[in-house]
């Protein structure tokens, strides 16, 4: 019952933030007082922070909005282009606590339940990957520095205002309808905070995505648990249906089997973020692969920071 409510709430929230109807826009404006309080807290946090220099190059890839901006594939592209990175992230919805080394020089040390889905993408996508999950990024940075990191790549690190770093901010495509902070809009930080980014990454300008489907079948049903499934709209016409789950959702084999049966589908169409959680289920999966290439301008900027 709770899972079904969570799925419905996620669907409603996605519409509220990206495709609001009249009543949802009205609700957003009624919630403005709370958004103003939230914004004030964030601004105070930003300007009261004392930056610490860790004596190592740190590049943060973050965004101002709630998920779905393409940070993970961009981090993968950066790490592939510039070796020696230790990738550090929180490991959202993982079942482990504290600092955990997910991969060391390409050797995967944890399963996806302990690492979280995004950390496992890094571990499986990057040759000789070094990946750490930690609620406290400072502990992880010190560990990486001691273990030979050339530079640190912070996934979703913009909010760490007390860490001296080079901030890349990714602008989502599509962007939220209302440029307001939570709960009126999808912005975790005020839209004006783009001015604090050292580099603004925009898909189609600074980097480019190329997607294709591996193991395509005749009747695919799209099943995904990403923050903004509208980014997969180009694949909707190739599927017999679409089923969206909340971001980082923990699938069960039983519910996926039921979806296959109810749609009469021959395979599940999934992103890599979904696939790392279900690859051992023994179900037929068609995989959406994603490759990001960096513009020459972007490469020049990064080369100066590494």
UniProtKB/Swiss-Prot annotation:
Keywords attached to this entry: ATP-binding, Kinase, Lipid A biosynthesis, Lipid biosynthesis, Lipid metabolism, Nucleotide-binding, Transferase
CC per GO annotation: plasma membrane
Binding site for ATP: 65-72
Molecular function via GO: ATP binding; tetraacyldisaccharide 4'-kinase activity
Enzyme's top EC category: transferase
Role this protein plays: Transfers the gamma-phosphate of ATP to the 4'-position of a tetraacyldisaccharide 1-phosphate intermediate (termed DS-1-P) to form tetraacyldisaccharide 1,4'-bis-phosphate (lipid IVA).
Protein name from the UniProt record: Tetraacyldisaccharide 4'-kinase
Gene designation: lpxK
């Amino acid at each position: 019952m709770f899972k079904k409510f969570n799925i419905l709430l996620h669907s409603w929230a996605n519409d509220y933030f990206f495709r609001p109807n009249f009543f949802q826009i009205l609700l957003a404006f009624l919630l403005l007082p709370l958004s103003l309080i939230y914004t004030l807290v964030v601004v105070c946090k930003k300007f009261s922070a004392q930056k610490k220099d860790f004596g190592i190059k740190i590049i943060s890839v973050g965004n101002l909005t709630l998920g779905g901006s393409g940070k993970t594939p961009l981090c993968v592209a950066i790490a592939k282009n510039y070796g020696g990175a230790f990738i550090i992230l929180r490991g959202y919805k993982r079942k482990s606590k504290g600092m955990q080394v997910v991969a060391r020089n390409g050797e995967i040390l944890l399963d996806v339940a302990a690492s979280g889905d995004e950390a496992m993408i890094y571990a499986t996508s990057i040759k000789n990957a070094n990946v750490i999950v930690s609620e406290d990024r400072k502990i992880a940075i010190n560990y990486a520095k001691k273990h030979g990191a050339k530079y640190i790549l912070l996934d979703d690190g913009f909010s760490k205002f007390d860490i001296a770093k080079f901030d890349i901010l990714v602008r989502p495509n599509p962007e939220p309808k209302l440029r307001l902070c939570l709960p009126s809009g999808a912005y975790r930080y005020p839209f004006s905070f783009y001015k604090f980014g050292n580099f603004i990454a925009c898909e189609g300008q600074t980097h480019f995505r190329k997607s294709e489907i591996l193991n395509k079948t005749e009747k695919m049903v799209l099943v995904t648990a990403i923050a903004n499934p509208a980014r997969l709209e180009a694949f909707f016409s190739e599927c017999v249906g679409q089923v969206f789950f909340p971001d980082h959702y923990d699938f069960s084999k039983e519910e996926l089997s039921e979806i296959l049966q109810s749609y009469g589908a021959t395979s599940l169409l999934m992103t890599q973020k979904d696939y790392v959680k279900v690859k051992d289920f023994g179900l037929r999966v068609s995989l959406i692969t994603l490759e990001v290439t960096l513009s020459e301008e972007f490469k020049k900027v990064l080369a100066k920071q590494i």
